[in-house]
Amino acid sequence: MTKETADGHFGHFHPYTSTNSIPNIQLAFKWGNYLITDQLRTKSDRIGDKGDRLPMVPHFRPFFLPFSVFSVLLLAAQGLVCRKEKVSPVGMNFGAMNVECGQYVQHCAHVGRNNHSGLRSVGVLSARRKQSEFVAPVGEVHAFVVKCMQSVGTSEAHAAQLADLLLDADIVGHYSHGLNRLCIYIEDVASGVKGDGEPKVLKQKGATAWVDGCDLLGAVVGNFCTELAIKLAKEHGIGWVVCKRSNHYGICQHYPKKIANAGLLGLSFTNTSPIIFPTRSSQIGLGTNPISCCANSREKGDGFILDMAASTVALGKVEIAKVNGKSAIPSAWGADSAGRPSTDPLAVLDGGGLLPLGGVSEEDGSHKGTGIAMMGELFCGLLGGASFGKNVRSWREVQKAANLGQCFVAIDPECFAPTFVDNLQLFLDQTRGLKPRDPSKSVLVPGDPERMNSERSAKAGGVIYSEGQIRDLEELAKKQNVDMFPYKANL
């Protein structure tokens, strides 16, 4: 996908996408006020370039031949290097070749929908041009999600629960787990995940329960187990619920926050599709297996909200980096197909994976992230009788049941010291009050970034989305034959 500027210029493309592609190159130049970028066409759609020819722009023919020859040689050399090193040419900045035209340059690209994890949500703008932001009414976005899910046979009640989940993520700023993943849930239901029904309690003893998620949407299973954990905690002081046969349940904090709003301390764990290279391993073998712990403090709207993966970041963060046009990510985030740290988001998503919390080596503490991921399997995959470790299906294998295990814990603080809520408030305030290293950056506690983003959303009067996200959602709306929600510029 390309975008034309007011001056008729186009920019940012992928000149080389596979060892089989045959670039059709035309360099166009105008001598004087500006230099216009080159134009390509490729037959390969390996990273999503559909072979669309960019419109021709004026050029100086005397300079066409030498620069064309130079570009062909450059691209050929790039191809050899990429083949030898097995890296994406885009990550080498050849694939994002840009010729600056002063104020005229604008960059826009569309990359492929499939990646290593099977998360089908990409549409990239170059980082060289700052994206615009848009705001959409919460109710309209909610209705959009419901209609999209109903288009594949999901019941309205189940679709509404998923919409609540995705909006929660976007409003608090976790875009990696919001509407960015709507296409995944659509494809899951289209591929066999049940869009209606109810989980079943298989076993209940005292404060514990074992639940069969019946291959329903993770949001539905998560809500069912959360409500059951709250009920058990009100009766016994603690409720511990584990399930099997669930699916991706979205942002982990969504469920402990519900528990916290019931006056309890909430915990939640889930296992996920393998995407982490365990410490010392050159093969993927663990999921990100996030954990969340939430508790409300004395002041309304304040509290502790921890939501973390056993990887340095969630895979969706790498996706969002790509959606927002970032050509490089921190080296501790992910690795290429051989388990080597990589700053190229495409290398991470296309055959690579994530690194455990702590990075690549024991010296950096990666064994701790590996241990946390394995602990998640104890609580979810093993206690729940679900798939575990490398046995969990890949995101690509939508024809197989995910059979994820999840764990939900509710604890009544009233069963312990009577000062929990007040002391939690004191603890949070004292931590925030510590002297910062950088005076411009105050000390934060878990939950502060979410509160800041929620306030920003409220001030904007809706949910804030980037230009790249809006573009992807418009394409999804067309694909599902539903009306796109209205939005306006966030000024």
Give short role names for the model-derived ranges.
Residues 80-126:
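N-terminal mitochondrial targeting presequence
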Residues 128, 132-136, 140-141, 378, ...:
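Catalytic-core signal marking the mid-to-C-terminal active-site face
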Residues 210-298:
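A generic, well-ordered mixed alpha/beta core segment in the N-terminal half of proteins
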